[in-house]
Amino acid sequence: MKIVQNTVLKMNGLYKIYFTGEYDWTAKESPFLYLTCELPPPPLFRDEHYNNIIPQVSLFTILNKFNGETEKEYKTYKDNLIRKFELTKLPPYIILYIKRFTKNTFFLEKNPTIVNFPVKGIDFGDFLAEDAKEKHKDVNTSYDLIANVVHEGLPTSGIYKVHVLHKGKSQKPTSLTLKKN
């Protein structure tokens, strides 16, 4: 994965964000075990019927982070960084981690956003860098879902369940419950 970043300068106590053409980007190659996808923040208000709104987002929407064009701001203890991510090589298996839990000053929150994704034929070819597309031209860039791990319950408690596609059992997913120690 190629990570391109720039430091946001702090001037007079305020952060100055430059436009894309006004500053230098630094790029580095970084191997990855999984891709971290961030969910959009949940809505603050209820709908007109006073029901909680559970937003839905497509998998391809949260994967746009890796298209090499989308800029994301990250804060560290000493700097603010703007980063862009681009895939340079596709592994045999891709693990997607959807960041659902956030911790603020007071407590841990769980984002209830539903992620809609296809089970078969997820194409990662669009997220490859231009030079990597040439290398993967004759290679299949589509992936099928093999397993899914979900958390059920409150952020501080609950259980994790894994759904595994077992080809020997007529392609039906098997559900397993993982106990928390």
What spans do the regions from the language model cover?
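Detector for methionine-enriched segments
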Residues: 1, 11, 33-35
